[in-house]
């Protein structure tokens, strides 16, 4: 069993915390639980997901509402999907076709490889493969720069949503 945690904050204004628990069998990532908490000026919301691979169902809890959804295909939370994409790139099996568990539905979430480039972040300079999420909405974009030398660990993530841009860059490798 693996646990993946991400925390980000803008001093005094906003914070985000994501947690995912999953197993890896061969090339397949199987999430079991996930949660995402966003806080803005002290007010926050948490979205929880519980995956049941044996019944092929996922239960979403948000704002006191519980929704159980059928998984006809393996579905992922944000973090377990990132790990599945890494596994697929490592094993030459990247298809770009993935499913995300949302608050009230399971949504097909396509990705595409957008070439290779060398980028510099605080942790160093890396040759990367860029993977873009394909959004229906032109005002949104999400790009990941993954370093093959680090087993496709993301060294940069860039997201634009309604004109607001957020960049995350790798600062240190332990």
Predicted regions and their residues:
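Acidic, serine/threonine-rich low-complexity disordered tracts
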Residues: 1-53, 91-174
């Amino acid at each position: 069993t693996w646990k993946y945690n991400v925390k980000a904050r803008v001093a005094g204004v906003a914070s985000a915390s994501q947690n995912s628990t999953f197993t890896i069998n061969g090339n397949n990532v199987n999430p079991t639980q996930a949660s995402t908490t966003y806080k803005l000026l002290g007010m926050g919301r948490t979205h929880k997901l519980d995956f049941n691979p044996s019944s092929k169902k996922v239960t979403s809890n948000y704002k006191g509402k519980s929704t159980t959804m059928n998984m006809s295909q393996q579905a992922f939370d944000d973090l377990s999907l990132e790990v599945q994409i890494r596994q697929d790139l490592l094993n030459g099996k990247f298809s770009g076709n993935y499913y995300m568990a949302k608050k009230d539905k399971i949504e097909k979430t396509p990705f595409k490889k957008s070439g290779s480039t060398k980028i510099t972040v605080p942790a160093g300079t890396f040759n990367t493969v860029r993977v873009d999420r394909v959004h229906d909405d032109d005002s949104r974009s999400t790009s990941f720069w993954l370093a093959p030398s680090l087993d496709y660990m993301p060294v940069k993530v860039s997201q634009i949503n309604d004109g607001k841009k957020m960049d995350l860059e790798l600062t240190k490798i332990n």
